Regions:
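Short, well-ordered secondary-structure micro-motifs
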Residues: 20, 47-50, 99-102, 123, ...
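General small-molecule cofactor/ligand-binding pocket signal
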Residues: 36-38, 88-92, 141
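A short acidic, glycine-rich active-site loop
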Residues: 55-70
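Short, structured coil segments at secondary-structure junctions
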Residues: 128, 136-137
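Glycine-rich, Arg-bearing micro-motifs that act as flexible, cationic patches
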Residues: 109-131, 149-153
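Small/aliphatic-rich secondary-structure junction motif
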Residues: 2-55, 135, 145, 160-164
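Structural beta-alpha unit
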Residues: 1-3, 16, 30, 76-112, ...
Length: 164
């Protein structure tokens, strides 16, 4: 029998990805599924490795190790709340949307936040969550962050929407 596909969580260190991780871990606990937390990176987004010094650019492996350590530290407090959930980590070098879509091929569901650390480039290229909804190989859950992603006054009573 094959192992169940994991819940894949995209995590970039933002408060939005923390909300997504919490929801993904809760869902994993309820469904009895494992979790894989993915953080993609580039040299410009990676934390500075311990081997960095002025005038010396460390090898890519050192950046990869720094990203993996930062991810583990970022999610450690949350994982302590879900000790019964099996969690693995993946830190590929590449664009977030592309890497999450690739990883979604072996996932039950992909969980992402509404926004991340993308900044202005994300506005120009489209958000990672939009890319995932459009192209992921599995279902995608986009998690709203309480108090931030709320849009008061935008809902209409059902009967108002049915009027001619």
């Amino acid at each position: 029998m094959n192992a169940p596909a994991p819940i894949l969580i995209g995590h970039d260190g933002s408060k939005f990805s923390r909300a997504a991780a919490r929801r993904g871990l809760s869902l994993a606990r309820a469904l009895g599924l494992p979790v894989r937390i993915l953080r993609s990176w580039s040299i410009s987004t990676a934390p500075r490795p311990a081997t960095w010094s002025p005038g010396f650019v460390p090898p890519r492996e050192d950046f990869a190790a720094a990203v993996a350590e930062a991810l583990r530290q970022d999610v450690a407090p949350l994982l302590a709340e879900y000790p019964d959930v099996q969690v693995t980590f993946e830190t590929p070098h590449g664009a977030a949307g592309r890497e999450l879509i690739r990883a979604s091929e072996q996932a039950e569901v992909l969980v992402v936040g509404t926004r991340g650390l993308g900044g202005f480039a994300g506005l120009l290229l489209g958000s990672v969550s939009d890319q995932c909804v459009e192209h992921a190989a599995c279902d995608v859950l986009v998690v709203r962050t309480p108090g931030i992603d709320q849009a008061p006054g935008r809902t209409l009573p059902l009967d108002a929407t049915l009027e001619g």
